[in-house]
Curated annotation (Swiss-Prot):
Protein name: Small ribosomal subunit protein uS2c
PANTHER family assigned to the protein according to its UniProt record, in alphabetical order: 30S RIBOSOMAL PROTEIN S2 PROKARYOTIC AND ORGANELLAR, SMALL RIBOSOMAL SUBUNIT PROTEIN US2M
Name of one Pfam family that matches: Ribosomal_S2
GO CC, one annotated term: chloroplast
GO molecular function, one term: structural constituent of ribosome
Amino acid sequence: MKQKSWNINLEEMMQAGVHFGHQARKWNPKMASYIFTERKGIHILNLTQTARFLSEACDLLANASSKGKQVLIVGTKYQAADLVASASIKARCHYINQKWLGGMLTNWSTIEKRLQRFKDLENKEKTGVLNQLPKKEAATLKRQLVQLRKYLGGIKYMTSLPDIVIIIDQQKEITAINECITLGIPTICLVDTDCDPDLTDIPIPANDDARASIRWILNKLTLAISEGRYNSIKTE
């Protein structure tokens, strides 16, 4: 698919503040080729580069989802958490938006057991079994359920390792990125001017702090996922 099909509009990106980087003194020199200029001590990203890599990411996601591949979106910073949840639910993706638990991918067998525990407790809650238990035991199990729902609710239906992982903030989610590298799982990552683009398969140069920027990029990525899935259903 060509870039045009994703309706990537430079003016819209500017309105969303996608082009604003960090203070120039905090930059990572590896981001030099993605930076357009510096204004008042702030680096400005080259949106032509952003459009190019975003288009590439959308192509990959559309193709993957048309083949039934699973996508995980990770964004636990407060600016991104609710945006990640809503975009993921809309596109029927898995997501982590509270805290990355170490080993979430590299120790998947343990996470699988926790997910089973989560489902068992949810079932007991729905069927009223929890309320039939002694108060102390019921309270303990309900606390467990609250914690499991908070941290694992977004991957409740993930039955295997994801095929592609989308990362919202490279520095915040470095543990997740390292786990993906270890397992050879392809990553798509928003990279601000203080990031290392070499750590991800498809770096998307973008403001990873502003909600409007995160929302705009997420909308494009999840639209590609939904479109890929829709095209798959259409051709069946």
